[in-house]
């Protein structure tokens, strides 16, 4: 950050470092933010001042022009800031009608830095540092709130100005361990319905430089369960993800689960975070059991069951949950590849490792592919860690140990043939034997691979060609 600051000073602007960069600096954390406030210049003036130093582009959020992004000509600075450096003039609210949401944010270069700080989201983000002197501008006590790990809005208008801040507040709870004050909780409950007004890209798919929205950042924090409970208790969760509605308070009536579906979900998400698992696994944890209320049916044993049963429940909770995940992730504009990956985890999360022998491990890799195989194991591990028995027993340690042994077997079998490209023959070899390109050829290759997965010693050219002749 020091190199970036020196570069910005060299541009001849009276700039202030603002937002997350100052907050993280005061917390002793590394920051990737490079946001600067420049009083005395409007957006056009900023563009003219920055244009000689590189490529400039408008910075637009929620259809509002909020500043200018500079992609420096300096290769060293460009390497430090691949997404560019953001500059903005001071801004203020202007009323556009009688309603409480009827206003817009406009640039006002005559506004003081202190007044600009007063229209930001939270006090911990309303601190600026002047590059020229190092002076801190902290009109709202943000530094004291940082020391107390306290989260406060700058005003009652904060969530109305931008409802995304409802999710950002939750993200700070998860990511930075902040405690929301009572007034903020009241404001969240009042403004929760407004979160539906926020575009999906800003919540999920991400318009930020790192390509992640606030929900993803929340899940990647260290305390996502605390944030999700807060989201539930303030009403934000059900507004953001209505798929959660039937799951909240749903009693699973199972000897394996003493937790309601929502509490089990939060426990699984937290376990995935504690284990450092990937974003796809954490997203799958969020959705994996949401299909249970819809799929539930009561058996002759008097208990609820969640698997498919012809004539009673056409789809098990895994399929229902996968559909719910697909719809929610699409609505939140998650990238297609990530969405498909999460949906597959949810759809297949009920797999059982069994005895965990080498053949089963190879079949598991064959069916799921390398990436999804370990996603499923990671998710299963988190799912087991999030279980509590009816008497409050701890997670099932025997199942966890069996799963972790299976993971090691799968890891060892990665070098064994389990993909079509691992076969000692290919489609051209079979065409030379008289197979026709098309479904017949595909079925033959699949049969050869299945045979090799079960018996790797078969994976020689001669043996596979001989076996292929039998399939013609």
Language-model regions: role of each:
Residues 1-472:
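Catalytic cores of the polymerase beta-like nucleotidyltransferase superfamily
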